[in-house]
């Protein structure tokens, strides 16, 4: 995938399945398409598994001497089941703790980033009567909205200053899954 740091950083290595196709469109011009599915977090109940699905198309043009390259791509990424889901029932207690799925959409503090809007996932009973058995002493947080970013990338590479090369790139990302009503 051609992607920007706005979607995920270079050091992220995704495990999963991906495929790529390329087509020669004209001398020095080719098109490409990429698609993949990557598990992000798996649970015993597969209906709660978190996945990243991605698809991208683009073109790459190189001048006849190879001094200039222009590359453009647009991608759609769907982070499935990543958004927080508020619990409706009281938390499990006694022998059900750790067996009954609860708070599986929690967004751990260790991976939170600036700019992520959060919602309280605790069951309403835990908010109104915090002494209810099984209720945590503090709030449990999840991501407030869905993530379905569209990523548009354009790059120009100049190689006529060999042995140096100058890269100029621009990326625009919009989260098409964001809905203010979710917050």
Language-model features, listed with the residues they occupy:
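Outer membrane beta-barrel
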Residues: 1-83
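Detector for outer-membrane/organellar transmembrane beta-barrel domains
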Residues: 67-183
């Amino acid at each position: 995938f051609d992607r920007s740091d706005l979607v995920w950083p270079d050091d992220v290595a995704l495990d999963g399945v991906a495929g790529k196709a390329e087509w020669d469109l004209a001398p020095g011009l080719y098109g490409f398409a990429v698609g993949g599915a990557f598990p992000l977090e798996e649970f015993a109940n597969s209906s709660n598994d978190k996945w990243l699905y991605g698809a991208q198309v683009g073109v790459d043009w190189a001048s006849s001497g190879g001094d200039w390259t222009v590359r453009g791509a647009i991608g759609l990424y769907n982070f499935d089941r990543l958004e927080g889901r508020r619990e409706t029932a009281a938390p499990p207690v006694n022998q059900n703790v750790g067996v009954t799925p609860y708070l599986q959409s929690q967004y751990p503090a260790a991976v939170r980033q600036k700019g992520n809007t959060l919602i309280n996932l605790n069951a309403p009973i835990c908010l109104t009567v915090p002494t209810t058995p099984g209720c945590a002493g503090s709030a449990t947080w999840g991501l407030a909205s869905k993530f379905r970013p569209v990523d548009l990338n354009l790059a120009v590479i100049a190689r006529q200053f060999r042995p140096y090369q100058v890269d100029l790139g621009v990326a625009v990302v919009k989260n098409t899954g964001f809905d203010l009503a979710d917050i």
